[in-house]
Amino acid sequence: MVALRLIPCLDVARGRVVKGINFVGLRDAGDPVELACRYSHAGADELVFLDIAASHEGRATLVDLVRRTAESVTIPFTVGGGISSVEGITELLRAGADKVSLNSSAVGRPELVREGAQRFGRQCIVVAIDARRRNSGTDGWDVYVKGGRENTGLDVVRWAQQVTELGAGEILLTSMDGDGTQAGYDLQLTRAVAAAVSVPVIASGGAGCLDHIAAALETGPEGGHASAALLASLLHDGVLTVEQIKADLLARGLKIRP
């Protein structure tokens, strides 16, 4: 069994790390490279940078941030936001990113997933899916884009299967209902997607305590079956540390790097 991963997420807007609740009410959470170094030294397995303003406002992801991070940390990191071409993927990987995350651009042009995977290998291509539970009384979740502002009408599970077939090497799955609430991951969502695809699924949105993180990674009937847990508010606000979380997961018998 591959070791489970803890991945701090740094949502970036205008060069600063920000955090909100349900994708709104953003507040400043610090300098991205500074936080990246802190989490790297603390034992995080990977990092994710998401430029949450780029897709919405049409700006390119800051390559400078990638370069500075690559010079400062030794763990793998993913960058996403505003990547709309193979040239954009190339620029970020050359600047030092290990993976790129595609979200709105994958929905707008699914071929980009295949092109990126063919050029760089599927291990470099992450597809980020922002999911919101349907309020129509129908079971399931819809895919949202443009920073959670636009409902595509796509079914999350079917979309995850489609991008995996196109070449995505990993799914970054965010519950918009849970994002920033610290009320727990949407385990039903994570479990449904993990069961439907053959690539790792990263659980994101809602971690509030140690039990929530463990539940997302557990593989029993009530577990989330995720391969990794994305963490933001819990770490940025100092509620828990990477060391505390890893010690707890190891004590529960989960396979994770110490």
Swiss-Prot record:
Keywords annotated in UniProt: Amino-acid biosynthesis, Cytoplasm, Histidine biosynthesis, Lyase
Highest taxon of the lineage: Bacteria
Disulphide bonds in the chain: none
Catalytic function, reaction form: 5-[(5-phospho-1-deoxy-D-ribulos-1-ylimino)methylamino]-1-(5-phospho-beta-D-ribosyl)imidazole-4-carboxamide + L-glutamine = D-erythro-1-(imidazol-4-yl)glycerol 3-phosphate + 5-amino-1-(5-phospho-beta-D-ribosyl)imidazole-4-carboxamide + L-glutamate + H(+)
Family matches, as Pfam families: His_biosynth
UniProt entry tagged with the keyword Flavoprotein: no
A molecular function GO annotation: imidazoleglycerol-phosphate synthase activity
Chief subcellular location: cytoplasm
Name the record gives this protein: Imidazole glycerol phosphate synthase subunit HisF
Organism field: Synechococcus sp. (strain CC9902)
Gene (name only): hisF
